[in-house]
Amino acid sequence: MRWDVIILYAISRPYATRRTGSHTHPRDSRYIAANQRRPPSACRVGPSPAKQRKDIPIFELLDTTLIKNALFALTSFLYYRTNILTCPFLNFLYLSRTGQLDKFCKDQTVTQILAT
């Protein structure tokens, strides 16, 4: 067998755990017996924990690195595509992320930058 096939097989078995030389699996008889003691899903009250939606505040969402990088990529694309950003905030953001803001601010104030 090839090593990459063995590694992929090992990764694709998330339920297999080593316990004193034997492997346990969800289809194990102990697992089935434990599941049969639970009431059926029709008898449960309320949504299942997997279906409950967790609301994320918008500020937490904007604080993620993925959103910041996507916004930076958008500003970079607009900056190089048009060479003039129509939105002053994106222009300010692009200059601050690329480190060009100090060079740009030598003779202008922040309000003048935002007004451009």
UniProtKB/Swiss-Prot annotation:
Record's protein name: Putative uncharacterized protein YJR120W
UniProt GO BP: cellular respiration; mitochondrion organization; sterol transport
Record key words, sorted: Signal
Signal peptide residue numbers: 1-19
Region (Disordered): 18-50
Keyword Signal among UniProt keywords: yes
